[in-house]
Amino acid sequence: MSTQLSPKYNPAEVEADRYQKWLDADVFKPSGDQKAKPYSIVIPPPNVTGKLHLGHAWDTTLPDIIIRQKRMQGFDTLWLPGMDHAGIATQAKVEARLAEDGISRYDLGREKFLDKVWEWKDEYAATIKEQWGKMGISVDYSRERFTLDEGLSKAVRKVFVELYKKGWIYRGEFIINWDPKARTALSDIEVIHKDVEGAFYHMNYMLEDGSRALEVATTRPETMFGDTAVAVNPNDDRYKDLIGQNVILPIVNKLIPIVADEHADPEFGTGVVKITPAHDPNDFLVGQRHNLPQVNVMNDDGTMNELAGEFAGMDRFEARKATVKKLEEIGALVEIEKMTHSVGHSERTGVPIEPRLSTQWFVKMDQLAKNAIANQDTDDKVDFYPPRFNDTFLQWMENVHDWVISRQLWWGHQIPAWYNADGDMYVGEEAPEGDGWKQDEDVLDTWFSSALWPFSTMGWPDTDSEDFKRYFPTSTLVTGYDIIFFWVSRMIFQSLEFTGCRPFQNVLIHGLIRDEQGRKMSKSLGNGIDPMDVVDKYGADALRWFLSNGSAPGQDVRFSYEKMDAAWNFINKIWNISRYILMNNEGLSLDQASKNVVLVTNGKAGNVTDRWILHNLNETIAKVTENFDKFEFGVAGHILYNFIWDEFADWYVELTKEVLYSEDEAEKVITRSVLLYTLDKILRLLHPIMPFVTEEIFGQYADGSIVTAAYPTVNPAFENQTAHSGVESLKDLIRAVRNARAEVNVAPSKPITILVKTSDSNLEDFFKANVNYIKRFTNPETLEISSAIATPELAMSAVITGAEIFLPLADLLNVEEELARLNKELAKWQKELDIVAKKLSNDRFVQNAKPEIVQKERDKQIDYQTKYDATVERIKEMEKLIK
């Protein structure tokens, strides 16, 4: 326990070595208390592709807030860290680095290339862990996992083999999305569709007998070398007589048949479509129905192969131009129709994908999806926050396609299938015995292993492992809405299939971090923010405060430095009031302060302001805890901010100066006790969000770490509505006088006459009993509080609940301006009355709302009417003065 805070809040000093101290003290590990309820979270594993961005900071801050609070509440918490190998993304990064030296992965070979990728992984994993430390992420590093760890690899192999045995993983030749740059297959959700400028190329296919030509149109003329038919609708009278005949494929000059198929739409274009089964998913199905050949005319790098004839070796887009030119030369080009159309692009490399016939491995999704959908109607369902994302999840599951899981990469989980020279295939968790077997060179989609993350990290398939039995299913997952299908849905159906239960109880969905203008952050816009730059300038606590308070669950948040300034200012305020309290503490211990607070609550010591702040503290604890439980961190933060800044700092701390500057030593001890006790509860409430600064201040007056200190709970003894109402009225009076002074530019230092008229005897007694506070904050020359006060002829006035306040200012006041002010105030009360009246005239509200809520509205109506009537009277009095 240290003894003094620095005069100025400096986050760099506060946060410098704190994280290492936490690690050295092992405060992030599970408590091991078997009597405590377990609460576990697995980190959304960041890709080892580079440094973390603001989205990653959000992904880790929110679950860290949750786990820190649960740890303080006495749960046996596990916050498990780890990283994802991110197959295609990481391999692309390493290949780009090698390309700078003119080296390709093929130059190195698989083994040496993978050595380079592991070097990359080690480099960036260290960077990511350093960033986690700077953000204060309270994970248990003794359980750190990586998706290519042997334990996780074992789980991947078992899942693959089990699904294969059930017939839910199969190998087949189908049209898939092909990334020519990465030279790998992609799943549908790894394809981003963008509107691009393109064209419909219209060309003539001449009938075999030369009697007429059929006009077809395509956006990809370079694929025509793979055409194996043209199709017309069987009900299209224009072409019925041509079905079964042949046309001549231009340039290639080979015959292809005219087939009848519903795929051809008579209403679209000429009603004739070219069929390229190896390069279009719809054409592939037509080809299957008509037993057409499948002619692949492209290499895996997007260049044309030998079947493209003179265009072989050309890039597909160069071949497009050359093909169109050739069609024009031979008179087969009809027209080029410019248009904008949607083209799929690889999410990772950004290049246009190529629909391509390829032999791949697939997961049959039908039954897995049905199981996931059905589970959402059981007690074991996954709860989404906000709930609307449950509908998003179900929609995707209801419309899911088979999942292509093989990738033509080297970095990843190699598919556990082996082939021999006889054409036999073996699928198993271990390599087959004997010689002559060669393992499938493809690897699995990164999301295949990520889908097992919640249970593979806990030791599965060893269901007897201590972590699996204790911490699985996990409690909460935090992630962005953009990967609900990529990751969340897959974890759900894989967990249901292999563990028999949901992978997590709750899923908290957050949005995206956008720039100040609402744009998505991207390299192309140059608007990305490095979170470490923000931490260096403002501190991690300020960034965590922004990330937790920026938006509601599921909503995007806009980053701005103005918001960061506000966050820093708030922490600076906390620092300054903490310094004030600790400087006036006189060695008082927290234990003794807590005992003295008991005397305050039972009325044996202290004053009404002490009981007021404890009452409000109690309400704050209740509301913050309630909103934390609903993952409404923004609401909880707003409540904390208002209590700390407005009620505690601006009011209570100022009110205590009346005692601390007095000669009453016994009363000073009580005031110091309430200050320290309240500060301590504030720091504990704030700790999950602001771990660094709260630990620093906590260490000034307490032993141990705030990380494992008890989280505040509601104390019924603090409930004191009388003190609350009284001090709120006192605040209203002081505010009214201050506002009136400000309106007529009367300096606070100038003594004035203050008249307080009230017919409420209890309020009159309360004001008189606490007149010292009124005098301290309003600086009156004369202060009169009575029910018998005559309304002055010329005075500033204000109406508060239960009282009227007059400030005789005849020589300072402009009557016309005061009248305008009163009319404005009258309009305000009328507006409030209209709002309440509308609610109370709504039968559905009165009948269905809770009785206490309805009564609250009725109380408001009485209060507003009283203020309205008093304001009307003051207007009449002012109007008399004018006359």
From Swiss-Prot:
Top-level taxon in the UniProt lineage: Bacteria
> Position of motif 'KMSKS' region?
520-524
TM annotation in the entry? none
Pfam families referenced in this protein's UniProt entry, alphabetically:
Anticodon_1 (PF08264), tRNA-synt_1 (PF00133), Val_tRNA-synt_C (PF10458)
Coiled-coil ranges per UniProt: 809-883
Q: Which reaction does it catalyse?
A: tRNA(Val) + L-valine + ATP = L-valyl-tRNA(Val) + AMP + diphosphate
Q: Which NCBIfam families match?
A: PRK05729.1, valS
Q: What does this chain do? A: Catalyzes the attachment of valine to tRNA(Val). As ValRS can inadvertently accommodate and process structurally similar amino acids such as threonine, to avoid such errors, it has a 'posttransfer' editing activity that hydrolyzes mischarged Thr-tRNA(Val) in a tRNA-dependent manner.
UniProt domain comment = ValRS has two distinct active sites: one for aminoacylation and one for editing. The misactivated threonine is translocated from the active site to the editing site.
What is the recorded name of this protein?
Valine--tRNA ligase
Species this chain originates from: Streptococcus mutans serotype c (strain ATCC 700610 / UA159)
The gene is valS
